[in-house]
Regions:
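N-terminal capping/linker segments that flank leucine-rich repeat
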Residues: 1-100, 108, 224-250, 256, ...
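C-terminal capping segment of individual leucine-rich repeats
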Residues: 67, 83-85, 95, 106-108, ...
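Conserved hydrophobic position(s) of the canonical leucine-rich repeat
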Residues: 71, 86-88, 99, 110, ...
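Conserved hydrophobic beta-strand positions in leucine-rich repeat
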Residues: 74-76, 89-92, 113-115, 132-136, ...
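Consensus "Asn ladder" position of solenoid repeat domains
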Residues: 96, 118, 136-139, 157-160, ...
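Canonical leucine-rich repeat
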Residues: 101-102, 123, 144, 165, ...
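Short, solvent-exposed S/T- and G/P-enriched segments that are highly enriched in secreted/extracellular
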Residues: 250-272, 293-301
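Surface-exposed interfaces of beta-sheet-rich extracellular modules
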Residues: 270-296
């Protein structure tokens, strides 16, 4: 490992929390290794690992992965670098209560990062030409600039505190999970390879994924959305799928394949529309372009791949009162 990368790793693990406990100390006492290998039971996503692949960088905590003298992984090792579909992996540093700033800028050989469920408060990822997977779900991060990660295929920054994110310079992006943040908008028009998108539980009012013809897995629920413009999944990007909300509520959209325990598709699919009435309003139904009510279900499961242009209608509840 080169001097720069070793110093970057040492600095991250030297950071201490409010009780003076360093990240390195936490890793030694809290790390828990999970893995999926060829012999892992097909009904399990992963298994506990009593032994790990011999890739630990000398003088640094477990989870710093060195291969052929290069820093290639932090918190995760993917032996064959085969991301889609992911066949095998070892994960080391989830839920270790790691804190502070994750400055990996200039770690030009780093390919994979997996630091889910920690307390990392900020990240600097400048000059990261090799990074393909960035997994930082469930931390305390308020900002992420991915513009210098041109090879990145997967970003999971869900369950953080982001108010915005710019992915316009990530043309290789296949997965983007930004759910449970504070986003008010999201532009994916420059991500033509995007297949998996999670934006649920933000503050987005208008979502347009028509620039993502390969999108097959979308969760856009739990937002104050008044309009969603998408393409019917499985239709090669030719058929519209649009939802709008009349005054009195919001809409949500989800579609996805059904997966087994190892995140492989079963051949079954789901496509659903969701209506959210405001306080004082009731949902009336879903209306098509002709004005016909086609469903009165708040959460309507449709046929996967259906092309529709729908409007969710709501009516205000009028409370009558009488004087005695």
């Amino acid at each position: 490992m080169n001097k720069h990368d070793r110093e970057v790793m040492a600095a991250f693990f030297a950071q201490v929390d409010e009780n003076g406990i360093s990240n390195a100390e936490k890793v030694e006492t809290r790390h828990h290794v999970i893995r999926r290998i060829e012999t892992t039971s097909k009904d399990k996503s992963y298994e506990d690992a009593s032994e790990t692949i011999d890739n630990r960088a000398e003088g640094l905590p477990i989870g710093v992965v060195e291969v052929d003298g290069k820093l290639v992984g932090l918190g995760i090792h993917i032996p064959n670098e085969d991301v889609y579909p992911l066949q095998s992996f070892e994960i080391y540093l989830r839920g270790c209560d790691l804190v502070g700033n994750l400055d990996i800028s200039g770690c030009s050989d780093l390919v994979f990062v997996d630091l889910y469920r920690n307390r990392i408060s900020s990240i600097d990822a400048a000059n990261m030409p090799s990074l393909r997977i960035l997994g930082l779900q469930s931390n305390q991060i308020t900002a992420l600039d991915p513009t210098e990660m041109p090879a990145c295929q997967g970003i999971d920054i869900g369950m953080n505190r982001l108010e915005s994110i710019d992915v316009s310079r990530n043309p290789e992006l296949v997965e983007l999970y930004v759910n449970d943040n504070c986003l008010t908008s999201l532009d994916t028009s420059h991500n033509a390879k995007l297949k998996y998108l999670r934006v649920q539980n933000n503050a987005i009012t208008d979502l347009d994924t028509t620039g993502n013809p390969l999108l097959r897995h979308l969760y856009a629920t739990g937002n104050p959305l008044v309009r969603i413009r998408a393409l019917a999944p499985g239709g090669e990007g030719h058929q519209p799928l649009e939802l709008t909300a009349e005054e009195g509520g919001f809409v949500g959209l989800s579609f996805n394949p059904i997966y087994n325990a190892q995140w492989k598709e079963t051949g079954e699919w789901e496509q659903s529309y969701h209506a959210y009435p405001d306080d004082g309003f009731l949902f009336v139904g879903w209306y098509d372009e002709s004005g016909k009510c086609v469903s009165e279900e708040l959460d309507w499961m449709d046929e996967y791949g259906a092309s529709r242009v729908l409007q969710a209608n709501f009516v205000q509840v009028v409370c009558s009162s009488s004087l005695v």
